[in-house]
């Protein structure tokens, strides 16, 4: 009769322990790979969400400035030559760099298109009137020598209210995107001011995130204004008034 050798208890235990250790190691590797993949997926989704949403959002009504560009007494040419767009950082975003190399402002006007009119940023405080904000343009923008008065070039800048002095608009800080449109009718080049029913499209694009685009239409009626010019003294007085564009 042939003898057959069986497995004793201790040998079976060793084999089972080996199986358990190998299975545990494989389970740990699989779990670790799963957690790593999940984390990477979250990061990709977060980056995609950041690229799909703008870091800026409009924080209130857009205010425009109406001016009578005709300085002849009793004669009127009331147009819009400046806009202020209130901005803030979108929820979940840390901030946006306002340096001209990292932000662009595109304009689509009835008379044409500007690829980038952004010229910088400036800091101010709450309580300043519109004319003060328009006068405090940063270095690199066209100087505004006569306030109130027309602008000799079309440009844009961000006016930071109650900021900390750096170039980053952060959560809790307020910014005004100032658009100044060429309204100098004495120059030989075409002007860019807006008349009733005209539409303006503004696009802000930062180095990351989606662009912020907004459109506004000038209302059919503007405030009654009358700029004057004294031929004897050569003094010109421009009449201006704010307009709420919503």
From Swiss-Prot:
Primary localization: other
Disulphide linkage map: none
Keywords: Archaeal flagellum
Propeptide residues, chain positions: 1-6
UniProt entry tagged with the keyword Oxidoreductase: no
Family annotation (Pfam families): Arch_flagellin (PF01917)
GO terms for cellular component: archaeal-type flagellum
Classification via InterPro entries: Flagellin/pilin_N_arc, Flagellin_arc
GO molecular function per UniProt: structural molecule activity
Subcellular location: Archaeal flagellum
Keyword check for Amino-acid biosynthesis: no
Entry's family note: Belongs to the archaeal flagellin family.
PANTHER family on file: FLAGELLIN B1 (PTHR35903:SF1)
Protein role: Flagellin is the subunit protein which polymerizes to form the filaments of archaeal flagella.
Protein name in the entry: Probable flagellin 2
Organism the protein comes from: Aeropyrum pernix (strain ATCC 700893 / DSM 11879 / JCM 9820 / NBRC 100138 / K1)
């Amino acid at each position: 009769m042939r003898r057959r050798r069986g497995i004793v208890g201790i040998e079976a235990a060793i084999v089972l322990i080996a199986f358990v250790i190998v299975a545990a190691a494989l389970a740990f590797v699989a779990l670790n790979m799963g957690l790593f993949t999940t984390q990477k997926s979250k990061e990709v989704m977060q980056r995609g969400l950041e690229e799909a949403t703008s870091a800026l959002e409009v924080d209130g009504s857009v205010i425009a400035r109406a001016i009578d560009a005709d300085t002849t007494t009793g004669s009127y040419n009331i147009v819009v030559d400046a806009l202020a767009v209130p901005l803030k950082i979108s929820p979940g975003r840390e901030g946006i760099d306002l340096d001209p190399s990292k932000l662009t402002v595109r304009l689509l006007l009835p008379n044409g298109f500007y690829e980038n009119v952004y010229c910088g940023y400036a800091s101010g405080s709450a309580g300043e009137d519109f004319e003060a904000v328009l006068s405090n343009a940063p270095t690199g923008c066209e100087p505004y020598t006569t306030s109130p008065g027309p602008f000799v070039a079309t440009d844009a800048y961000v006016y930071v209210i109650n900021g900390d002095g750096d170039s980053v608009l952060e959560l809790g800080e307020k910014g005004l995107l100032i658009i100044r449109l060429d309204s100098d009718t004495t120059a030989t080049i075409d002007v860019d001011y807006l008349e009733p029913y005209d539409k303006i499209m503004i696009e802000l694009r930062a180095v990351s995130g989606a662009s912020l685009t907004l459109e506004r239409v000038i209302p059919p009626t503007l405030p009654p204004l009358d700029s004057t010019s004294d031929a004897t003294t050569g003094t010109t007085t421009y009449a201006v008034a704010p307009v709420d564009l919503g």
